């Protein structure tokens, strides 16, 4: 079990589906079905592997729809940010934000927004009802201590390194796309410094960011004339930050549209801050009440919830609690891996919050809520575009982090179909767990709610459970392979549940994660 050295393993309680529940998408009272597990703790790599098998978390509850039985099959969807080009409607939203910030312009007429997974609470309500019925009573501290003792008894050092200093120094990390300068908070839009005018015979006005890059490049050239490129790469700046001069007719990039300079007398100032939500950073704690008030108004106005709901504890349970262990490896993103809130601050107050997970291969969007007074800004679309840009920023240092997961795509649900407009994107095949371009999937979904997207009839799940006896079980304060555990069990339903769990999480996760059994 060397894979646990230096860190804690994932610990989960598995609960197989026993019934159908109300569907939050089509409102069928007994149409939704999913299997779930309560994650006491989970490594970011395990969760990455799980979402690549169709799982998804809500708080600490991780669930996987029974795709061929549930009324609204939910297909994991991911966007490829490195090839992403904003559509006309996306550009319209970004320009609308710029006009509002620059001149305070408010568009006329109503605006239909696209909040990420706006029906998530309803969609998993049945699953949470199941968890409540089971009356889970587990002392997490005791469980953690038991695991630690078990690991130590096997000669493994399970002491977890707490990146306390890094977490404190990175309570919030401002987005600084294309900037190599360390900063804790960076304004989304900066006032341009005085430069050359609009006279066409003179060079165009340059952004301060570009000027800083040029100065840094010249300085490195003086220090190492023969190796300026290597100098930038050594400092973590990939060559992509310094592309060849674009042709005048080349369309603007996503970053150009988001970070377009504002006039000196701009009406509003927008900042985006990324704060770690689990374990909660000091900045997260300091803004928790304000963030909750935004969520409460969002639920009351957008989802018509009564004023006494949701409570702060419900908010914390769904959107702040996370099983993901914070990790800050040297080759990872500066903010580390784990669960975060991406806060949108307008003139010093929070107007929207995107709940995200930063994982080894992707940024995963969990939820978005916003102040209904700013619905006219299409914050659902705007935040998705910002998260795509954020993924591209993280990719510059961590090359394998190159995807943006948008949760589930439900072809039969109009509220969820918009996710397919962020192209290029892929859907996960529910049988072989390979990614298939969405264009190839849509014709099949027009004919049937449930589809196998992989067209190769011989293809199988490459990570299917082939050696269930190697599955790791945590039972009576001891860690053991399932092959040992099953000799102590006489209940056939227990074996069926464990084997089902193994088939759903796959061989790799079954050998790494600890399945908690009473």
Curated annotation (Swiss-Prot):
One GO cellular component term: cytoplasm
Protein EC: 2.3.2.8
InterPro entries per the UniProt record, alphabetical: Acyl_CoA_acyltransferase, Arg-tRNA-P_Trfase_1_euk, N-end_Aminoacyl_Trfase, N-end_Aminoacyl_Trfase_C, N-end_Aminoacyl_Trfase_N
Keyword Metal-binding in annotation: no
Enzyme's top EC category: transferase
Modification Phosphoserine occurs at: 169
Principal location class: nucleus
Keywords: Acyltransferase, Cytoplasm, Nucleus, Phosphoprotein, Transferase, Ubl conjugation pathway
UniProt-annotated location(s): Nucleus; Cytoplasm
GO molecular function: arginyl-tRNA--protein transferase activity
Reactions catalysed, as given in the entry: an N-terminal L-alpha-aminoacyl-[protein] + L-arginyl-tRNA(Arg) = an N-terminal L-arginyl-L-aminoacyl-[protein] + tRNA(Arg) + H(+)
One of the protein's GO biological processes: proteasomal protein catabolic process
Region (Disordered) residue spans: 175-203
Summary of the function given for this chain in its UniProt record: Involved in the post-translational conjugation of arginine to the N-terminal aspartate or glutamate of a protein. This arginylation is required for degradation of the protein via the ubiquitin pathway. Does not arginylate cysteine residues.
Subunit structure: Monomer. Interacts with LIAT1; LIAT1 is not a substrate of ATE1, the interaction takes place in the cytoplasm and seems to increase ATE1 arginyltransferase activity.
Record-stated family: Belongs to the R-transferase family.
Name the record gives this protein: Arginyl-tRNA--protein transferase 1
The organism of origin for this protein: Homo sapiens (Human)
Taxonomic placement: Eukaryota, Metazoa, Chordata, Craniata, Vertebrata
């Amino acid at each position: 079990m060397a894979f646990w050295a230096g860190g804690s393993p994932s610990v989960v309680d598995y609960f197989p589906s026993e019934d159908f529940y109300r569907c939050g998408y089509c409102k069928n009272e007994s149409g939704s079905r999913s299997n779930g597990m309560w994650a006491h703790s989970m490594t970011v790599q395990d969760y990455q592997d799980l979402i690549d098998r169709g799982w998804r978390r809500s708080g600490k509850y991780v669930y996987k729809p029974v795709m061929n039985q549930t009324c609204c099959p939910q297909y994991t969807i991911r966007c490829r940010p490195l090839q992403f080009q904003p559509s006309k409607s996306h550009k319209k939203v970004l320009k609308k934000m710029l006009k509002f910030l620059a001149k305070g312009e408010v568009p006329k007429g109503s605006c239909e927004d696209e909040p990420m997974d706006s029906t998530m609470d309803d969609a998993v309500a049945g699953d949470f009802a199941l968890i409540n019925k089971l009356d889970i009573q587990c002392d997490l501290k005791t469980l953690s201590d038991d695991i630690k003792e078990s690991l130590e008894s096997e000669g493994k050092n399970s002491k977890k390194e707490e990146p306390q200093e890094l977490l404190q120094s990175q309570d919030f990390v401002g987005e600084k796309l294309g900037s190599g300068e360390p900063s804790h908070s960076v304004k989304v839009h900066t006032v341009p410094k005085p430069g050359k005018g609009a006279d066409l015979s003179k060079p165009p006005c340059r952004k301060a960011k570009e000027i800083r890059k040029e100065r840094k490049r010249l300085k490195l050239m003086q220090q190492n004339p023969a190796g300026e490129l290597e100098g930038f790469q050594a400092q973590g700046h990939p060559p992509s930050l310094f592309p060849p001069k674009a042709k005048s007719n080349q369309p603007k990039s996503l970053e150009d549209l988001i970070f377009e300079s504002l006039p000196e007398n701009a009406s509003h100032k927008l900042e985006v801050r990324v704060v770690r939500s689990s374990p909660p950073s000091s900045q997260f704690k300091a803004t928790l009440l304000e963030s909750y008030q935004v969520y409460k108004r969002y639920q009351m106005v957008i989802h018509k919830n009564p004023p006494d709901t949701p409570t702060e504890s419900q908010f914390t349970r769904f959107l702040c609690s996370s099983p993901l262990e914070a990790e800050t490896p040297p080759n990872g993103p500066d903010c580390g891996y784990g669960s975060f809130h991406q806060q949108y601050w307008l003139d010093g107050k929070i107007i929207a919050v995107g709940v995200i997970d930063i994982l080894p291969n992707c940024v995963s969007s969990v939820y978005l809520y916003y102040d209904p007074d700013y619905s006219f800004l299409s914050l659902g679309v705007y935040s998705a575009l910002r998260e795509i840009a954020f993924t591209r920023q993280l990719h510059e240092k961590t090359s394998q982090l190159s995807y943006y997961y948008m949760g589930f795509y439900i072809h039969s649900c109009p509220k969820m179909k918009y996710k397919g407009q962020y192209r290029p994107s892929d859907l996960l095949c529910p049988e072989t767990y390979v990614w298939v371009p969405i264009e190839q999937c849509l014709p099949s979904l027009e004919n049937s709610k449930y589809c196998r997207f992989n067209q190769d009839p011989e293809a199988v799940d490459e990570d299917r459970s082939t050696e269930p006896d190697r599955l790791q079980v945590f039972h009576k304060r001891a860690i053991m392979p399932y092959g040992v555990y099953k000799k102590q069990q006489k209940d056939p339903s227990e074996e069926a549940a464990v084997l089902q769990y193994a088939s759903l999480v796959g061989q790799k996760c079954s050998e790494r994660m600890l399945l908690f059994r009473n």
